[in-house]
Amino acid sequence: MKKYEIMYILRPNLDSKDVKKINDTLQNVFLQAPNQILEQNEIGLKDLAYLIDNHKKGYYNWLMVKADNDAVLEFNRIVKITEEIIRFIFIKDKE
């Protein structure tokens, strides 16, 4: 299993229930054994450095996880089909 750092940004026009639902869906991928969430931070609504899909703000979320390849593939699949996610980055840690 490898360690990954993940950051994703949600559309700013979502209400808190929708933000929580999406966060829970994405985090559940890493809550199934043997995967685990090491750290998480729901940063909240922040200004974007530049417009993304005509949005000036977005809900930022950050995760540090240990995951196998299947979890990484499932996370990427979910992110790509979820329209509320306007940007994401998935980085493998050096460990």
Swiss-Prot record:
Keyword annotations of the record: Ribonucleoprotein, Ribosomal protein, RNA-binding, rRNA-binding
GO MF terms held by the record: small ribosomal subunit rRNA binding; structural constituent of ribosome
Q: Does the keyword Ribosomal protein apply?
A: yes
Any keyword Transmembrane?
Answer: no
Q: Name one Pfam family in it.
A: Ribosomal_S6
Q: Which domain of life is it from?
A: Bacteria
Gene Ontology biological process: translation
CDD domains given in the database record = bS6
Recorded GO cellular component terms are: cytoplasm; ribonucleoprotein complex; ribosome
Family note: Belongs to the bacterial ribosomal protein bS6 family.
Purpose of the protein: Binds together with bS18 to 16S ribosomal RNA.
> HAMAP family of this UniProt entry?
Ribosomal_bS6 (MF_00360)
Give the protein's recorded name: Small ribosomal subunit protein bS6
